[in-house]
Amino acid sequence: TRFTDGFEFGFGAEIGISTQKLTDEAISLTGLQNPNSQQQLVPWLNSHSKEHPDDPDLLDNLQKATVEDLLKNKGHLPEDVCQMLEIRQQLGKTSIKKYVAMDTARGEGDRVRGLTQYYGANRTGRWAGRLVQLQNLPRNYLRTLDYARELVKAKNYDGLRMLYGNVPDTLSQLIRTAFIPSEGHKFVVADFSAIEARVIAWLAGEQWVNEVFATHGKIYEATASQMFGVPVERIVKGNPEYALRQKGKVATLALGYQGGTNSLIAMGALKQGLTEEELPDIVQRWRQANRQICGLWYAVENAALAAMQTAQPQGTNGLIFALEGDLIYGQSFLTVRLPGGRKLFYPKPFLQENRFGRQAIHYYAVGQQTRKWEVDNTYGGKMTENIVQAIARDCLAVTLERIAARGLQVVFHVHDEVIIDAPMDVHRLGGA
């Protein structure tokens, strides 16, 4: 992937200027020696937000979610506290650190290589993002990004701040534009549509979902129709029934892997206008409409448990669960053979009661925080998620080979999407 001209001396310099100016502003506002320090800033915010010394503290941490929640009600905060929280939010914009990573990783021809690691995700075998971490780029919503780019390349910090206000946010939106195609080419982006919903329905044999994807493809409307008994033709803009689409959407995205109300909340159900009281009903209705998918969770868990208990292979839904080992090296694995032939591995598995008092599969995994081997446990829904994402990954792998066979260059890909550095006359990838 190639960088735009002016990246190093424009974008890179602007990050340092932006950070320093915000830090100077915070020091001037608070009088603190290091306003980036949580130990210094939390007491300052608490003391300046109280009308009386006995009032409760405003906050006890400066996590992203905490700052965001406080700023949603900034009308109730003193002006200096609100201003400092906004500065903190801008200073904490981790996405602009990607510019530093870009500069570090840049190689010959202003290109960055090695952005994905093959089989980087241990459980599913998916590619993992490396270096610049392009798998979680911030979205851009500014309509005048080209003008913002010119200001940055000219190192015009004051102009950028005067026109756009939040400089770190503007810089983060420009990250995508720092990557450009090769000379005479353009980026062509293609993605799978609702790939995980398709795979789990196919694997479980949820026929009505398969029929939706084979015809109109409106899975959110169709799900709402199944859940609430409303004709799908009524769930269109302008009709009161259209409000049900949101419930169908959040349920489809959140509940496929045995999740409940907490999964709906994590998917943003409350922020999308749903109330906590109606969430259990949504869970129940979705499960009633998707009995085959629910059955898949339990079939997967039972097959895995049986393989562990009997040391005999167990098959269900096109999957084969087995306990495998290597006597020479003393290794043992619970394996899951996918329909395509690839296997998933759960190292050093054993059975033990989980926190709910149920017999569950435990295995060793590298902790995301500790980066050390530690014991983890799993269940039917979680294993189903691993299996579905692994099958979707294999679909992507086949597609990458098909694209390469057509003489096109994939310069990056995410779990369900490919970015191709294509000649200007390429417009679509039908049949790939």
Region spans (language model):
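Short, conserved charged micro-motifs
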Residues: 24, 425-431
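Short beta-strand-to-loop capping motifs
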Residues: 420-424
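Active-site palm subdomain of RNA-directed nucleic acid polymerases
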Residues: 395-418
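Conserved pre-motif C helix in the palm subdomain of viral-like polymerases
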Residues: 193, 380-401
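C-terminal segments
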Residues: 1-28
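Metal-dependent catalytic core segments for phosphate chemistry
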Residues: 145-146, 196-230, 345-378
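Conserved "right-hand" nucleotidyltransferase catalytic core of DNA-directed polymerases
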Residues: 26-171, 180, 186, 193-196, ...
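Short, amphipathic alpha-helical "recognition" segments used to contact nucleic acids or chromatin
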Residues: 247-257
